[in-house]
């Protein structure tokens, strides 16, 4: 009977105290830097909020009008009268138009790149989309003022003729297409690359086994997307949409270049005129006196709070959907 000789395995060399202490020191340094970065972010946010609140309180204490409902903006008058009704309306309406146009198109482009386009086409198309996200706002503004506005004059006439009965597209004022509708279209073009890029990456994370299982059961490509890809990426699409909405709410130069500002509220979105928070601040800040700047900062505080509210609502929606998905897993 053959005897077997046990193989002797050398134990792992002991870790020296110096190496162990170096590793622990590195962990402590990294943990400290991470914690410090988080605290720094909170400090920056808090300092911005405190600064805006302090400067806004100075202006609001002397405002003779209702800050939320006054249509006029005359902070240099004696007594000063100013309000954000027109600015809030214009910001919300233009952002809604932008989201209504951009999100469906962005999701369609993202699905095409991730699930339909051949690889030779998907890679350059994704690169072009990412490149569009890096175009400066002022370039979009110049293009919108010199090209988009003249082109939309004909579209406005068509909408007025065939959809004017909806009241929203009833154009009651004569003028070029420097309206909230034009601003919404321009903002949609600007946020389209952001929503597309994030949605595309989310759709690419769908487990391959889920798609293959659905195809093996006889599902068509569209059924796979409808029953597997879209439900999986719903939270990501919401996050992408909120990123786009954040840019639409705070966009300044492009809106200021395209829009004809006026302090009027009209549901006729094709009529020229209107205003947004960012556009009004950019247009008036340099020429305003100290009190006028405080008034503009007060409107900036509202925009700051509006952005926080939108992002908070988006996070709440995403969290609830994740909890619902986990409960039904």
Where are each of the predicted segments found?
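C-terminal transmembrane helix and the adjacent membrane-cytosol boundary/short C-terminal tail
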Residues: 200-204, 208, 215, 283-329
């Amino acid at each position: 009977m053959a005897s077997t000789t046990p193989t002797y395995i050398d134990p792992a060399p002991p870790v020296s105290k110096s190496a162990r202490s170096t590793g622990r020191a590195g962990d402590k340094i990294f943990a400290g830097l991470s914690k410090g970065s988080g605290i720094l972010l909170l400090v920056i946010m808090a300092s911005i909020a405190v600064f805006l609140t302090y400067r806004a309180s100075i202006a609001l204490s002397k405002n003779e009008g209702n800050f939320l409902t006054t249509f006029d903006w005359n902070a240099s008058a004696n007594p000063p009268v100013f309000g954000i009704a027109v600015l809030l309306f214009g910001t919300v309406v233009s952002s809604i138009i932008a989201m209504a146009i951009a999100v469906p198109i962005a999701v369609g482009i993202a699905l095409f790149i991730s699930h339909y386009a051949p690889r030779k086409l998907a890679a350059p198309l994704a690169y072009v989309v990412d490149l569009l996200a890096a175009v400066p706002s002022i370039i979009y503004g110049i293009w919108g003022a010199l090209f988009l506005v003249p082109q939309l004059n004909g579209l406005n006439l068509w909408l007025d003729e065939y959809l004017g009965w909806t009241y929203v597209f009833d154009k009651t004022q004569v003028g070029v297409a420097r309206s909230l509708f034009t601003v919404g279209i321009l903002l949609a073009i600007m946020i389209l690359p952001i929503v597309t890029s994030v949605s595309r990456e989310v759709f690419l994370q769908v487990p391959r086994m889920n798609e293959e299982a659905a195809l093996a059961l006889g599902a068509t490509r569209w059924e796979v997307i409808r029953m597997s890809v879209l439900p999986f990426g719903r939270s990501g699409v919401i996050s992408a949409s909120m990123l786009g909405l954040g840019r639409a709410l705070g966009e300044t130069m492009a809106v200021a270049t395209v829009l004809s500002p006026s302090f009027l509220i009209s549901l006729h979105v094709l009529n020229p005129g209107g205003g947004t928070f960012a556009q009004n601040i950019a247009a008036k800040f340099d020429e305003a006196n100290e009190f006028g700047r405080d008034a503009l900062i007060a409107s900036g505080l509202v925009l700051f709070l509006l952005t926080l509210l939108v992002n908070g609502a988006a996070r709440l929606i995403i969290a609830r959907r994740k909890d619902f998905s986990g409960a039904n897993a």
